[in-house]
Amino acid sequence: EIMPSLVGSEMCIRDRPYSVDALFSAINKGRMVQFRYKKVGRPETRTISPWQMVWENGCYYLIAYQDEKSPAGIRHYRVDKMAGVLVLDAPRRGKAQFAGFDLPSYLKKHFNMYGGPEHSVTLRCTADLEPAMRERFGTSPILIPEGETHFHFTVPICVSDQFYGWVCGFGGKVEITAPAAVRSGLQEMT
């Protein structure tokens, strides 16, 4: 249920499939938003603090701080799954959490924008995959050679089925070596 006492203004967008303008307005004004999030079978009302928007995989995503559910923290929401976006009078929260926020790093660890528990994952790859790994993870990870045939590196990953699918897509040329729980998660899927 939307709380009328928090509502500052409702942005009505014509000729746009999503409430992008309302969200940009809230970001620029430093205000919280409330919306219905369309989850399969159970839409939920959310009240969050928007900070950034990104276009990824053909969709807009709102990067926001949420503290209405535990654990509080930075989350992302697909904008096309939002309905009834309201810009509230309440000032947004999460300034400390976004002070050092690095959007490119956030995007690299979320495969296809799916969330999951974050782990430091060590990947062992065949040498021919160096360009593909650099394209995905950038120049930050240190690639440690293992002779002339392989290398390994460690990166933060939000582990999800999409991450496991990405690993499998290399046809055995990428191996998860650590941590054991993430490695066994892939073995359970295959």
Language-model segments: which ranges?
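Short aromatic/basic micro-patch
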Residues: L6, T47, H76, T154, ...
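Single conserved hydrophobic/aromatic residue that forms the stacking wall/gate
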Residues: E1-G8, C12-I13
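Polybasic (Lys/Arg-rich)
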Residues: L103-T190
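Short, solvent-exposed coil/turn segments
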Residues: L6, A72, E146-E148
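Core beta-strand-centered patch of the WYL/Sm-like small regulatory domain
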Residues: E10, R14-T122
